[in-house]
From Swiss-Prot:
Pathway(s) it belongs to: tRNA modification
Residue pairs linked by disulfide bridges in the UniProt entry: none
PANTHER family referenced in this protein's UniProt entry, alphabetically: AMINOTRAN_5 DOMAIN-CONTAINING PROTEIN (PTHR43686:SF1), SULFURTRANSFERASE-RELATED (PTHR43686)
Positions occupied by motif PP-loop motif: 43-48
Pfam hit, one: ATP_bind_3
Organism: Neisseria meningitidis serogroup C (strain 053442)
Cofactor list: Mg(2+); [4Fe-4S] cluster
Tree of life domain: Bacteria
Protein's UniProt name: tRNA-cytidine(32) 2-sulfurtransferase
Length: 319
């Protein structure tokens, strides 16, 4: 097999893996429904480019109809290449809207020198995007956070916030007006890096947060990448833990009635047997990698009727 052919096979495998991971997340959390108008938030980074690209693929083949509109928030950062995103979006034929709001000056004016900008920037950006979604009549807002972002958020909340809290794949906004979805929830960041190289997306760096090397999130990200190299399967196992929560073996009295426990009650989640060691799944213990399209990360849930986004569109007569 030639080097070129081998690379083509690897690229096809990567594309299939990403498509299936996104499709599985959409199916598991019922992210997209018939007739949805989805606002895809496009920052110019690798993650949001990949999100839009994969959603377009699914839109073309899915058994349901839904609309996509790309939205970019031009925060008036110095040197921001305003022409890059419109040129790209017009070249692929995606409807889009560029929202111009000078949040850059606001963040720089309000925060002291040396302070991290992410929290304030995120709040300002979120409010503008919610307003834009309402103006466009969008039913869903799609963000480009991936699996590693979700895990990093969990550790940030544990280490610095004292909460066992991550980043939900799907949520309702605080005002109750918007459904926010994260279709990349099952996707590895390292796969997105490879995909961006394959697709040659015109990446735009962020001058606000990209220039702050000591951000807590970046430190956590470095920790996760180090673990992924030294302990194959650890990241997958941690994400699986987010989907297999046992409230009776934590310490939150709001989630479980510890005070009401009495002798003779039915065992809850195995009782003290839950402390016994369990056999580690082979793909976690030996570091081997399987075809991601065959791995079902989510635990088995109650039967419910969902539309498989990975299925094909129904054929029409005469097609």
């Amino acid at each position: 097999m030639s080097k070129k052919t081998k690379q083509e096979l690897e690229n096809n495998k990567l594309s299939k893996r990403l498509r299936h991971a996104v499709g599985d997340a959409i199916n598991d959390f019922n992210m997209i429904e018939p007739g949805d108008k989805i606002m895809v938030c496009l920052s110019g980074g690798k993650d949001s480019y990949a999100l839009l690209d994969i959603l377009r693929q699914l839109q073309a083949s899915a058994p349901i109809d839904f609309e996509l509109v790309a939205v970019n928030l031009d925060q008036k950062q110095p040197g921001f290449p305003e022409e890059v995103l419109p040129t790209y979006l017009e070249s692929i034929g995606v409807p889009y809207k560029i929202v111009e709001e000078d949040t850059y000056s606001t963040v720089k004016r309000v925060l002291d020198e040396g302070k991290t900008t992410c929290s304030l920037c995120s709040r300002l950006r979120r409010g503008i995007l919610y307003r834009t979604a309402k103006e466009l009549g969008c039913t869903k807002i799609a963000l480009g956070h991936h699996r590693d972002d979700i895990l990093a958020t969990m550790f940030l909340n544990m280490f610095y916030g004292g909460k066992l809290k991550a980043m939900p794949p799907k949520l309702v906004s605080d005002n109750g007006e918007h459904i926010v979805i994260r279709p990349l929830a099952y996707v590895k960041e390292k796969d997105l890096i490879k995909y961006a190289e394959l697709k040659q997306f015109p990446i735009i760096p962020c001058n606000l947060c990209g220039s702050q090397p000591n951000l807590q999130r970046q430190v956590i990200g470095d920790m996760l990448r180090d673990w992924d190299k030294r302990f194959p399967g650890r990241i997958e196992s941690m994400f699986s833990a987010l989907q297999n929560v046992v409230p009776s073996h934590l310490a939150d009295t709001e989630l479980f009635d510890f005070a009401g426990l009495e002798r003779g009650q039915t065992l809850k989640h195995g009782g003290d047997l839950a402390f016994d060691s369990e056999k580690m799944p082979e793909r976690f213990s030996d570091g081997s990698e399987e075809d991601e399209s065959e791995i079902k990360i989510a635990p088995q849930k109650a039967e419910r009727k969902v539309i498989n986004i990975l299925a094909n569109k129904p054929k029409t007569c005469g097609a």
